[in-house]
Structures are given as structure tokens and as C-alpha cells.
From Swiss-Prot:
Gene3D superfamilies: Glycosidases, Golgi alpha-mannosidase II, Immunoglobulins. Residues 166-229 are annotated as: B. The active site is at residues 256, 284. Substrate binds at residues 127-128, 167, 220-223, 254, 259-260, 354, 398, 402. The gene is cgt. InterPro entries: A-amylase/branching_C, A-amylase_C, Alpha_amylase, Carb-bd-like_fold, CBM20, Glyco_hydro_13_cat_dom, Glyco_hydro_b, Glycoside_hydrolase_SF. Ca(2+) 1 binds at residues 55, 57, 60-61, 79, 81. It is an enzyme of class 2 (transferase). The keyword Mitochondrion does not apply. This is Cyclomaltodextrin glucanotransferase. May consist of two protein domains: the one in the N-terminal side cleaves the alpha-1,4-glucosidic bond in starch, and the other in the C-terminal side catalyzes other activities, including the reconstitution of an alpha-1,4-glucosidic linkage for cyclizing the maltooligosaccharide produced. It comes from Geobacillus stearothermophilus. It catalyses: Cyclizes part of a (1->4)-alpha-D-glucan chain by formation of a (1->4)-alpha-D-glucosidic bond. Residues 607-711 are annotated as: E.
Amino acid sequence: MRRWLSLVLSMSFVFSAIFIVSDTQKVTVEAAGNLNKVNFTSDVVYQIVVDRFVDGNTSNNPSGALFSSGCTNLRKYCGGDWQGIINKINDGYLTDMGVTAIWISQPVENVFSVMNDASGSASYHGYWARDFKKPNPFFGTLSDFQRLVDAAHAKGIKVIIDFAPNHTSPASETNPSYMENGRLYDNGTLLGGYTNDANMYFHHNGGTTFSSLEDGIYRNLFDLADLNHQNPVIDRYLKDAVKMWIDMGIDGIRMDAVKHMPFGWQKSLMDEIDNYRPVFTFGEWFLSENEVDANNHYFANESGMSLLDFRFGQKLRQVLRNNSDNWYGFNQMIQDTASAYDEVLDQVTFIDNHDMDRFMIDGGDPRKVDMALAVLLTSRGVPNIYYGTEQYMTGNGDPNNRKMMSSFNKNTRAYQVIQKLSSLRRNNPALAYGDTEQRWINGDVYVYERQFGKDVVLVAVNRSSSSNYSITGLFTALPAGTYTDQLGGLLDGNTIQVGSNGSVNAFDLGPGEVGVWAYSATESTPIIGHVGPMMGQVGHQVTIDGEGFGTNTGTVKFGTTAANVVSWSNNQIVVAVPNVSPGKYNITVQSSSGQTSAAYDNFEVLTNDQVSVRFVVNNATTNLGQNIYIVGNVYELGNWDTSKAIGPMFNQVVYSYPTWYIDVSVPEGKTIEFKFIKKDSQGNVTWESGSNHVYTTPTNTTGKIIVDWQN
């Protein structure tokens, strides 16, 4: 997590939380009409399964076996479409709730056939693509999609699309008549199907058992036809397809199944997006309760995209929904993820989604939903709310967690919690950028503080349904004063009194009570809150958000090299990456008056445009505990630093031991030198002998090189 220089507050005036209104002078992270496509930290995202939201145009509903009138069969289309979302944008339901971004189902054309199962399952969810360059006609036309984007932007709402380049649709290796045989089309022209795949557009390695990372990448996910991203046609097709949707004006992408695609290819995809028109991109890497995966952290830190924060979502569900953990476990997760993720503020948080049971339980206490939303909206990360959560919708498992939207009541307590805290999130940078500090804790009570410079938000939550707790000995960074609850007592929060030394007068926190107290003040020195994107090339534009930059142009440095300033305001700077060598750099801002911010670290400068190359080495025998890695003379291969070598390589699916392989994002059109090394669990390195391998990487396509281990 980004660290900033703590500022000592010496004011002794009495402040009230109503001073939050002074934030309007700052111009929040998003200015009206200037949607920030690379920073979502102050946003509230609302996830919509398009087919299950609103049927705004009955004329585009499918017929026959694809459709379920009245949505009695939840595995078929029910009629929701882009016009329905437009209607709810224009009637104020989303804007009044405080939604500033929507994440919608994959918009591409899906299969028109149904599965031969008990339900006759259809592609309503959008994950069974047949043509990534055409719209799903049951959601609307391309013109309808453009109207949706325009309507959202007119109301200050960003649009995120789901995108699932891992696969097409269900297919069978032995039965070409099964559904649509996974066929892939390019704007209406057939490229190929899963059987008789002479061009090798797909993988044919059987279904994954989820036994290893390699197994999940190079085998089929269930019965879905797994795309071969190293195929030059597939590589170019998918990259062109995503740029087509970017041309429609989208602001973000949720990348499906990132755990199941080659990391190297995905980094080259992110480079393609950043080269073209950067948008906030986050991937889906499912983690179960209490699961910690180092590969998950590595991907988030090295791929150029963020992730859905399953560690956050699962832990909050354990604490407030399932009672299988307590606030100590949650606080530990907050600390651990702050260390594990370089950009923890960019990870997308949630309490439920379309792949898990809804948070609200049939016959359960809606107060738990309210508490969970309050924590979600005041915690680090980009908060995402699943459609209908604000209406206390229930449903365990697919498809019961994807029912038709039940109602649009603006008076539910959950709706009002979102409304109030979305406003606070937009207007107090502590929620967008602040560190998190635990201030008071027991199994039932969690008091935590978010702080960014002088901006402070203090939150207290009591999950118990029966116990009252006296909160004594609490200290805060809030200046001395009286603070009213930002929720207006909606969850029974009260006023607190803060002394001159930061001590909070004792108060009671009742069962199910949540209190939120806030303070904000103008910064006089520069403080960086966010940089996006965090990967680029020399000349790429980068947006720096924060406070106290001043109105006169100052200096931005990548390491010790000054960048060309494109635009400068007190809260946002746009610069071009200076002419520096490839590598990772700290960014600093110096105001025109000479004051310098703390460093914002780990911006990655790539060598040039990236392509995905498969490196294969034969006859690389190893001892127990050893793995093969690749290292070379370019930054993307570690610059001969064995601690930065790429690997471990794979040896089970596409090739078998003692042949090893890995797909790596490398600079295009460049003659590179490399070698393979053996590493054991203690980090001991054995180099292959002989001369360096030499390879000239391709341009604008994928590549492959096969060599023998040199003994």
C-alpha cells in the first residue's frame, strides 16, 4: 500500500463532521464531464447481470427454447437488456443511490443454441461467446450499446464490460453437433470450431482438474472450448475485439477467468490496451475462504491489471454473514493484503457476486447486509455492489443468485446506506486513498480509521445482535471537536467527542450499530493518492491523483528523471513517461513552491510494445525440488538477474518433462539473448553452459522458440 508522510495536526478548534462540505472546493477525484478511466478508487461500482435487471425493449427478447416468460426457468433468457439499464439511469434509480460505475455482462454475441440438460440452459449470462466483435442481439444493437454508454456518461457513470477471452462456448471433442461446437466468428465470418481444428485455434488437452496452475491454464475450464492464445490469429482477433469495445467509449474491463489464461499473453494484452487507450482493468481469480495464493498476488502485481479481491470478500462474509470468523481475522486480512498487493487500493472489493451465494440469507437479518455495505464502502479498494443487494435479494448458488431484479425501492435502509457512503467516498479522499489503521477491536467490534493527509474517516461496527459495548481508550487522528454520524443515525450511530490529544470520549456501541465520522481539510503540500495505469512505455500518458499539488505547474519525476507535464491541477496531473530505461520507478511530485511528495513506488516502464512468446527447452533434467526458469538480457527477462528470472516453467500439459515451457511477454522486434537456469527451493542456481541463446522476437504477433538445454 502506498505510504505517505503523516502530517501532525495541531489545530485545537472544535470541528464538526459537517465540515465535509468543504470538500466541494477540492474538486473530487472525478470532475463532472471528465470521467477518469484509470482511477476508480472513489467510485461505487454496481454489477448488473443484464438479462436479469430490466426488460426495456420486449422486441429484442429471444423466442422458443432460449426464453423463459416470467423468468420461471432461471437458466434461460428472461428479457433484460441495455435499454432497461438506460431506463434506470434516466429515472434516477442508479444515480440517486450514488452509483458512479456499472459493470455489465459481456456484451458480445453468444450462442443461440441451448444445452441438452434438464433446464435447457441458455447463454443469458454472456459467457458463451461466438463472436467477440458483434453485440448480443438479445441485449440490443451496437447503437443501443452506444446509447447506454452515452446515457451513463451523461449522468457521470462509468461503464465496465465483462470480457471473457479464455473460451468460446461448450463443446465436445468427439461430438461436433454438441451445441455450436464452440465455433468462433469474426464479425460474422466463421474462423473455426472445436472439432476438426486444423488451425489449432483451441487447446485440446482435456478438462482441467484444477490440480495445478498449468493444468488450469492449458486445459478446458469445464466443457468450454479453450482458446489457444499463442495462435497468431486468436491473439490478434482478441486484441482487436477488445479495442473495438474500447472505441465504443467503455471505461473499464472486468477480465473473466484470468487464472486460466497464460500470464505472458495477458500482460501483452494489457500493453495493447495501454498503448491504445488505457481503461481500468481487473481480473477474476477465484479464491475460496481462507485461501491465500502467491500466484494471485504475483499476477496482480506484475500483469498490469488489478483483481477482484476475494480475500476481502470472503473474509467479510465469514465475519458478518456466516459467523465463521471475527474481526481479528478481518483485520489480519487487511494487514496481509496491504503487504501482498502493490496496489491494494485498485483491487475490487465486494460482499457477493454472480458466482457465490447472495449475502442476504432467506429469513436472515437484513441488518447484516447493512453492516457489510457500510464496511465495504468505507474500506480500501474499489467497492462493487451486486444488483439487488440493496433490495435484500436472496438466492444460494447459480442460478438462484441471478434472479430477476425484485424491486426498485429507494427507501430500503441498504439503498440509503449506499447513498450516504457513496457521497462520502466521492468527497473525502481518505476513503479513496487512505491507509487503514485498527483503532479498537474485539471479536464483535471493529473500529478502524482511514487517513490520507489531513483527511480522516473513523468507522465503528458492532456485529453482535445482542451485546452492547462501551468503547473506552479510543484514539483517533480526527482533530479535536464534535463529530456527527455521517449515516445520520441510519444504523444507530451517534455523535462522538474528540479531545485535543486525539482521545475519544467513551461511548456505547449498541447491537448492530455502525457509526461513521469524518473530517477533511485542504492540503498545502503535495500528496499522491493514486497513479494509473501503473505500467507503460516511454511517452505513454499517466494520470496522478492526489491533493496539494498546487495550481501552478511543478515537476514530476520518475526516479530522478523529470517527466513532461501534459496538464496540472491541484488534484490531478497528467504526464508523459520520460525517456528512462525499462524497469520500476518511484514517482514524486514537486510543487511550484518546492515541496516534494513522498514517493509512489513501482511504476513499471516496459522496453517497447509487447508480444507473447513461448520459450521451450528440451532435455532439462532436474533433481527433486528444482525447477527451470528463464533469464535474459532485457528487462522483461530479468536483465540477467536470477532473482528476477521468469518461472517456474511448466512441464506437464503442452509438453512433458524433461521438456519445459512458458509464455512470456517480451519486447517485439528485438534480438534478445537468454539462458535457462535451475533453481531449488533454497534459491540455489545452476546455469546451463554454452553460449547464450539468441532469438529475434516477432512484431505484432506471437512467437515460439525451442532449444535444447546446454550441458
